[in-house]
UniProtKB/Swiss-Prot annotation:
Descriptive protein name: Signal recognition particle receptor FtsY
Keyword Metal-binding among UniProt keywords: no
Membrane-protein topology: Peripheral membrane protein
Organism name: Haemophilus influenzae (strain ATCC 51907 / DSM 11121 / KW20 / Rd)
Annotated positions binding GTP: 216-223, 298-302, 362-365
CDD domains: FtsY
Example GO BP: SRP-dependent cotranslational protein targeting to membrane
Predominant cellular place of this UniProt entry's protein: membrane
NCBIfam families: ftsY
Biological function: Involved in targeting and insertion of nascent membrane proteins into the cytoplasmic membrane. Acts as a receptor for the complex formed by the signal recognition particle (SRP) and the ribosome-nascent chain (RNC). Interaction with SRP-RNC leads to the transfer of the RNC complex to the Sec translocase for insertion into the membrane, the hydrolysis of GTP by both Ffh and FtsY, and the dissociation of the SRP-FtsY complex into the individual components.
GO cellular component, one term: cytoplasm
Pfam family, one: SRP54_N
Localization: Cell inner membrane; Cytoplasm
GO molecular function: ATP hydrolysis activity; GTP binding; GTPase activity; signal recognition particle binding
Length: 414
């Protein structure tokens, strides 16, 4: 018995040891199998879900409230925005109250464009003289410097000498105490030169058609000036016809026809190389038959054939007088201000050939040589009808001497 009891104890001991080691006995009795590990799944407690749901609903409710507030604000602002927009439109179309002044017209008008157009010329004369006279005493040296500056501005020797002579006489009579008074007197002297020639063109309605013969060298803006004048007269209620008398340049004829088509103005033209006098004669007949108020005739400007050109212009005038002995009623020379002293020689040449009655000075906005207008006015005493300070139709305006002088001498801050 003792032996059996001891044997059972030994077997249990060995089995216990095998279980620990995972040996044979453990395999035999299935004790070595690993139990399947339970799958770990995310566990969301229902109570936490219940706690979160009210928070989400609260946030969503807050968002809706914010959106409603934004919508209410936007709706409230709409009438204000409409009022502001209406006020802006009202301001935009509100007529500007013009302050009466003898110095210059209202801001934004032709005077404003004239001031801008004369910026380059003002650097040499006019407002550009303010710094020149500042702090200087009146003596011979000052007059010499002034004379040099006037010549640089293309005022020319004869006109410059005349201005200096008059200023010197005022100074010798003790009428000018300082350089500022000399500056003001210079303005007066220059105005005195321009005022006698500021004569606008007056159309005689008893003469139908009233014939304007345009002359000038190629490139001065003659054909463009014709188009602008035609539009101006048309806007005044006058009927206009154009005659393409520059038959040597196809481009000139085409340009005139474009102006005519654009403004519904009839243009009389013939083929390139036709006789200019014949074209203009036909135009006079046509204008009379249609009861046209104003006929503007273009002419050639080939200065390289100076003698031939002058002979042709003389012929045109003779032929025109055969139809109407009072025609042409205006012989207007177009000059480019940028040519400086060359404009003087051109004026002399055309005046001797056909006898000018008026001048249009173009391209004043693109040159520093605008001082030539004083030389032209002083030497020829011919009426200056129009000046051009830009490419727009309204930039060709009747010449006003006082307005021109004010624009020339006005300062940026004034």
């Amino acid at each position: 018995m003792n032996d059996i009891f001891i044997g059972l104890q030994l077997r249990e001991h060995f089995m216990a040891e095998e279980n620990k080691k995972g040996g044979f006995w453990a395999s035999l009795f299935g004790r070595n199998k690993k139990q399947d590990e339970p799958k770990i799944e995310p566990i969301i407690e229902e109570e936490k879900i219940k706690d979160i749901e009210p928070s989400i609903e609260k946030f969503e409710a807050n968002d809706l409230v914010e959106e409603e507030k934004i919508q209410e604000i936007s709706t409230a602002l709409e009438p204000i925005e409409e009022i502001i927009e209406a006020k802006n439109l009202e301001d935009e179309f509100q007529p500007v109250v013009e302050i009466e002044t003898r110095e210059k017209p209202s801001e934004g008008g032709f005077f404003s464009r004239l001031v801008k157009g004369l910026l380059k010329t003002k650097q040499n004369i006019g407002a550009g003289f303010r710094g020149f006279f500042l702090g200087k005493k009146i003596d011979d040296e000052l007059f010499e410097e002034l004379e040099e500056q006037l010549l640089i501005a293309d005022i020319g020797v004869p006109t410059t000498s005349k201005i200096i002579k008059n200023l010197t006489e005022h100074a010798s009579r003790k009428e000018l105490q300082d350089a500022e008074l000399l500056y003001q007197q210079l303005k007066v002297e220059m105005a005195d030169i321009l005022e006698p020639v500021a004569q606008p063109l007056e159309i005689d309605s008893t003469k139908k058609p009233y014939v304007i013969l345009m002359v000038g060298v190629n490139g001065v803006g003659k054909t463009t000036t014709i188009g602008k004048l035609a539009r101006k007269f048309q806007a005044e209620g006058k009927s206009v016809m154009l005659a393409a008398g520059d038959t040597f340049r196809a481009a000139a004829v085409e340009q005139l026809q474009v102006w005519g088509e654009r403004n519904h103005i009839p243009v009389v033209a013939q083929s390139t190389g036709s006789d200019s006098a014949s074209v203009i004669f036909d135009a006079m007949q046509s204008a009379a038959a249609r009861n046209i108020d104003i006929l503007i005739a273009d002419t050639a400007g080939r200065l390289q054939n100076k003698n031939n050109l002058m002979d042709e212009l003389k012929k045109i005038v003779r032929v025109m007088k055969k139809y109407d002995e009072t025609a042409p009623h205006e012989i207007m020379l177009t000059l480019d201000a940028g040519t400086g002293q060359n404009a003087i020689s051109q004026a002399k040449l055309f005046n001797e050939a056909v006898g000018l009655t008026g001048i249009s000075l173009t391209k004043l906005d693109g040159t520093a040589k605008g001082g030539v207008i004083f030389a032209i006015a002083d030497q020829f005493k011919l009426p200056i009808r129009y000046i051009g300070v830009g490419e727009k139709i309204e930039d060709l305006r009747e010449f006003n001497a006082k307005e021109f002088i004010e624009a020339l001498f006005v300062h940026e801050e004034e």
